Amino acid sequence: MDSKYSNDHLFGEFNSSFKALQWHSYEVQGLESNNNVTLLGSSPSTKYQIFKYKNHAYGIQFHIEIKDNTVSQWGCVPEYKKALEDSLGKDALKKFDVKAQENMKLMNFNAENLYKNFKKIL
């Protein structure tokens, strides 16, 4: 998160850096010339990780919601497992699950805050 957007309605209370689940490498691109789009956060793999259009819509290119079986369930889909291994190598599913478990409490905390903030702007 870019700290200059600390007053944002959804993400203003988030730390400037936080953990989230990103499974694939698909991403929104080419928004640089759109003056109505504000980039709120990036990651090493995805420039437009969090963005918003005016004050009407947000784009979030990751999963902030996660359960203890999310990675194992998604890993049952052959295409998903292959995509993960193509990006992160052999045994990626197991390593990814370990990291998800390690960060689950914080990710769930952030998911709850995002939901609370979203309800405030409705």
What are these regions (language model features)?
Residues 1-69:
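Pocket-forming structural segment of enzyme catalytic cores
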Residues 64-122:
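Acyltransferase
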